[in-house]
């Protein structure tokens, strides 16, 4: 297989939940588990801990709210706590997005690269809501199997769409029942860094083409802080034995499209906020001495105002 630029990824690579990109879903879910166990959590994901702990002992330790795996490392504990705060804030942002979308009458949801996202189980969806989850087959199978074994029941009609987003996912989505005549609430959370820039542009092209009037989109756009991310994941590797190298899994082309600008020039009315602003608004401001250790992102919400023209 040929190598893809600015990453150690390879064309057509796949992964199980504890491997490669799949393992990052465990790391994110572990942060949601930590937040859920807090005294005054911003979000509640009662499924996060079991999804993470079922992957093995080291992962279970990562999901423990006391962060005991970082004992003796005060800086590491503070940095990881801020990272968990950010995951809580971004989850809250997108939970609110879905709430506003269904309040506006949207009843069709597509979660791109769903990973261990449990919104189809934990949010209170209106009757008739359909949630499509797109991801690698092994990731979707892992999540569904664990949740089923613990008696979890979806709160919407859930459809797993097992397909790689670098492949013909629109065909798979339509085959699963997606209705292109109905407005859709799309979500791309924690996804873009794991796609080459041209693949990200194609993804947005396809989302726009599939969107009926009234559709909405939410996106997490990254400006990767290489130093902070690398050091945090290195701590997980050194202390827990988790073999994850996020730097090697992500793409860093300097000429990638700006997600907000792309959407705005393709018929979407976009509102954005930086993660730092949103964290401060929700009482989770980043300590000044840790700013350089923290990921930089922009959280976007968009509404389709110019319907896509048929091909």
Swiss-Prot record:
Gene3D superfamilies xref list: Vaccinia Virus protein VP39 (3.40.50.150)
GO MF entries: methyltransferase activity
Residues binding S-adenosyl-L-methionine: 135, 164-165
GO BP annotation list: methylation
InterPro entries in the record: Ppm1/Ppm2/Tcmp, SAM-dependent_MTases_sf, SAM_mthyl_Trfase_ML2640-like
Function: Exhibits S-adenosyl-L-methionine-dependent methyltransferase activity.
Known EC number: 2.1.1.-
Protein name: Putative S-adenosyl-L-methionine-dependent methyltransferase MRA_0152
Organism from which the protein derives: Mycobacterium tuberculosis (strain ATCC 25177 / H37Ra)
UniProt similarity note: Belongs to the UPF0677 family.
Signal peptide: none
Sorted UniProt keywords: Methyltransferase, S-adenosyl-L-methionine, Transferase
Source species, domain of life: Bacteria
């Amino acid at each position: 297989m040929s190598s893809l630029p600015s990453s150690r990824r390879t064309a057509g690579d796949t992964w199980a939940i504890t491997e490669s990109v799949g393992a990052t879903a465990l790391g994110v879910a572990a942060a949601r588990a930590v937040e859920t166990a807090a005294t005054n959590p911003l979000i509640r994901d009662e499924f996060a801990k079991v999804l993470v702990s079922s992957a093995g002992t080291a992962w279970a330790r990562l999901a423990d709210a006391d962060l005991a795996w970082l004992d003796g490392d005060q800086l590491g504990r503070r940095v990881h706590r801020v990272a968990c705060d950010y995951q809580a804030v971004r989850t809250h942002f997108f939970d609110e997005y879905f709430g506003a979308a269904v309040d506006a009458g949207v009843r069709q949801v597509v979660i791109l690269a769903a990973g261990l996202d449990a919104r189809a189980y934990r949010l209170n969806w209106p009757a008739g809501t359909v949630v499509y989850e797109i991801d690698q087959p092994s990731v979707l199978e892992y999540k569904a199997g664990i949740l089923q074994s613990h008696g979890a029941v979806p709160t919407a009609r859930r459809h797993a769409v097992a397909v790689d987003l670098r492949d013909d996912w629109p065909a798979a989505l339509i085959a699963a029942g997606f209705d292109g005549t109905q407005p859709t609430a799309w979500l791309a959370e924690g996804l873009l860094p794991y796609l080459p820039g041209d693949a990200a542009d194609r993804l947005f092209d396809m989302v726009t083409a599939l969107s009926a009037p009234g559709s909405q989109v939410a996106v997490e756009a990254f400006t990767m802080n290489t130093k902070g991310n690398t050091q945090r994941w290195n701590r997980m590797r050194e202390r827990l034995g988790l073999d994850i190298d996020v730097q090697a899994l992500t793409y860093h082309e300097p000429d990638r499209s700006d997600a907000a600008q792309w959407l705005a020039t393709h018929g979407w009315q976009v509102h954005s906020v930086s993660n730092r602003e949103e964290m401060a608004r929700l009482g989770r401001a980043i300590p000044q001495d840790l700013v350089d250790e923290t990921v930089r992102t922009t959280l976007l919400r968009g509404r389709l105002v110019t319907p896509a023209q048929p091909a």
